[in-house]
Amino acid sequence: MASRQGSKSRKAGLKGADSTASSTTSSSKLYQETSIDGHSSPASSSAQSKQQFFSPDPLPQTAQRSKENVTVTVRFRPLSPREIRQGEEVAWYADGETIVRNEHNPTIAYAYDRVFGPTTTTRNVYDIAAHHVVNGAMEGINGTIFAYGVTSSGKTHTMHGDQRSPGIIPLAVKDAFSIIQETPNREFLLRISYMEIYNEVVNDLLNPAGHNLRIREDKQGTFVEGIKEEVVLSPAHALSLIAAGEEQRHVGSTNFNLLSSRSHTIFTLTIESSPLGDKSKGEAVHLSQLNLVDLAGSESSKVETSGVRRKEGSYINKSLLTLGTVISKLTDVRASHVPYRDSKLTRILQSSLSGHDRVSLICTVTPASSSSEETHNTLKFAHRAKHIEIQAEQNKIIDEKSLIKKYQREIRQLKEELEQLKQEIVPVPQLKDIGADDIVLLKQKLEDGQVKLQSRLEEEEEAKAALLSRIQRLTKLILVSTKNPQASRLPHRFNPRRRHSFGEEELAYLPYKRRDMMDDEQLDLYVSVEGNHEIRDNAYREEKKTRKHGLLNWLKPKKRDHSSSASDQSSVVKSNSTPSTPQGGGSHLHTESRLSEGSPLMEQLSEPREDREALEDSSHEMEIPETSNKMSDELDLLREQKKILSEEAALQLSSLKRMSDEAAKSPQNEEINEEIKVLNDDIKAKNDQIATLERQIMDFVMTSHEALDKSDIMQAVAELRDQLNEKSFELEVKAADNRIIQQTLNEKTCECEVLQEEVANLKQQLSEALELAQGTKIKELKQDAKELSESKEQLELRNRKLAEESSYAKGLASAAAVELKALSEEVAKLMNQNERLAAELATQKSPIAQRNKTGTTTNVRNNGRRESLAKRQEHDSPSMELKRELRMSKERELSYEAALGEKEQREAELERILEETKQREAYLENELANMWVLVSKLRRSQGADSEISDSISETRQTEQTEGSF
């Protein structure tokens, strides 16, 4: 943060004096000492103090702080006139005070701590979402308030607001000073820092030279090195610094806003407080930080951007994505690593998100249906953040290194030095009765002592004036309530809420009107052409710098010059000035100087001086609040001169009284009488000077009244002049944009005519192509169908013939088998009979007969053989015929099988042809579908055409006919 964050990672056991704490400033490890001559202002600090030690507030056991969750609220903005004109509908709405529900799907709903409708004011949002965080910060508990949402959802309006409706940051600053006013038993020191994160680069908005600052980390946490911190004395002082920082912030025009935030900003208010008076000795100092974060809006990928805007959007989305990832990891108890280092935003806010700060998240959403998805993502992010548990702790600095302690010690030391200077004034001893001889010697000693005393008095007067100025300057930095310290602050908690009334001087530093809800004409004007973004950004940035509203506008350029020169003397002048707090509502804070309380120097003044102070007090009552730092400085200078003259007059009165006593004792001493006369003349001259200064003060007060009246007139004239310049600039820009739009319109008209001709040609080509394709396809399909029918008839005829031949062959084969079986049985019988006869013949013949009748037997045998062969031939002739028939039947079967094989081959070939036909038909269907796509595109671009519809109907009838085939 702007200064070091507290040590949030310390263990629970280290809650004593050994715990490390956050330091009070943040650019280096040593604090820059402030010299008396004013070359280094205590009001502006950019140095880093040494290591400090603090511990959480040891609460009683009955009041131990319990865990709590992040406060999450949702704020709806109303529909813009542009969205209403475009007919946008409400997609999300607030269902009661805690529920957000989807209009189209009521089952989708999310619950939060509070949901604010479009009519809710920012003051009500502050009371619910931010007041408890600010109140805790004033008590020593760190706090962080986020504004999260998409572009044009109202984040910057919620955080900064305008003169009619101040935002969270002005209300928080005003509330902080109101709490100081209501806490009379403590004294406070407030300082602020303001930074931005643009394209992952950290810039200091209070110091134009502070670019690309580095983020450091030590045992105490993360801090930004070199960030400038400014001590603030009043709400107007703080708001003026914020306004100066806003002029340095990166903004630009987008498709949604004329002036859209292109960077994340972190406004840090560091609060130190200690018990008032002697109670502060040895007491711990409460140290806390209040971080008010205005996040840049996430951008959808649907938004067409280029160049710088695209680069900015990518960095913004990256940091917001990292923030969402960190939130998801913090809600996941199983997550072991949280990617804080993936983005500068999460790394700076690491201490705030670690669970020891009180955090409030304000999600701004739009109910428009065109942003329904982005709104849903925002609601889911808020829902995840609601589950983060925190345990807020009070931080106390237990050493003497805090800035408020340093100022208190320096004030005490300066007062002691002032007392020593007063005591070192050696009174002139009382003259006793002396002789005439010693008169000359005493006269010479008196002259020498008078010269030395005069020079010493002059030196002491200069030293006292410097010490008084230094004491007053340091005392003004510490803010103290004007209420009675004996009054307790507790009863005010039960009273009605205090109202945040802003004076004219404070409202002067707020924007004149909210920038996120632009007029329709301006919005249409500045988003019409993409290429003019950079020119419009530069022009409106200059216009933003020159347009200032309020009574103190004429001082702002001078203030910016001082800040740009980076001189510490400007901060000194600012610190010397009386805080200009508006007198409104009774809740303003008076920063009073405690120099007059118990000061011995003030007791030495005479009654005429008291009368002059009474006159001065009356002039204070008549004085109205200063309208500028210049008036305040001049008035303070006149008062300081009068005080110095009064002190010199008091010293001369004491010297006059002493010399009067000496003159009474020695009335003959002419030198003493002359010195008394000189002192009387000096006192008279000083009284005349004091009277002149009083008249100047009164004239200055009266002049300030007249200046206020003149400033009102000048303000009205300046506002009219600004409005005239604004309208003329808008008229010029509108005329230029109109010319560009007219040129673009002419180009688009020519393009439309060319496209119409192309569409007509395409229609004609499409109709011809459709007719040709349909005719060709029909002819091909008819030819294929005819060929298939003929092939089918031939195959059926051939199949019938083959079936008949097969049945005939089967009949012949069965008959041949029967005959062959009968013949085989007869052959077997004949063979058996022949064997039996041969056996009988062998048994009947004797061996001798066989020998004698060998020849006869042989002849008989041969004859028998011949007869048997003849008989066998007679028997074999039918079998040969059967074999021949069988052989013929086998040949027929083989021919039948060959015919069947040819038939199968023909069927396979026909199936292949049929498959190719189907593939060709599918190809033609795909081509027809492509033609239909082209026809649909043409019909969407030019409307329904009767000729195309007729062709479509004919094509569909053709497809139905083909389907029947």
UniProtKB/Swiss-Prot annotation:
Region (Disordered): 1-69, 551-633, 842-888, 942-965
Key words, A-Z: ATP-binding, Chloroplast, Coiled coil, Microtubule, Motor protein, Nucleotide-binding, Plastid, Transit peptide
Bias kind Basic and acidic residues: ranges: 606-623, 864-888
GO biological processes: microtubule-based movement
GO cellular component: chloroplast; microtubule
Residues annotated to bind ATP: 149-156
Major subcellular location class: plastid
Protein name: Kinesin-like protein KIN-7K, chloroplastic
UniProt biased composition (Basic residues): 551-561
Pfam families the record matches: Kinesin
Keyword Chaperone assigned: no
Domain Kinesin motor: 69-388
Taxonomic lineage from the root: Eukaryota, Viridiplantae, Streptophyta, Embryophyta, Tracheophyta
Gene symbol of the encoding locus: KIN7K
Organism whose genome encodes this protein: Arabidopsis thaliana (Mouse-ear cress)
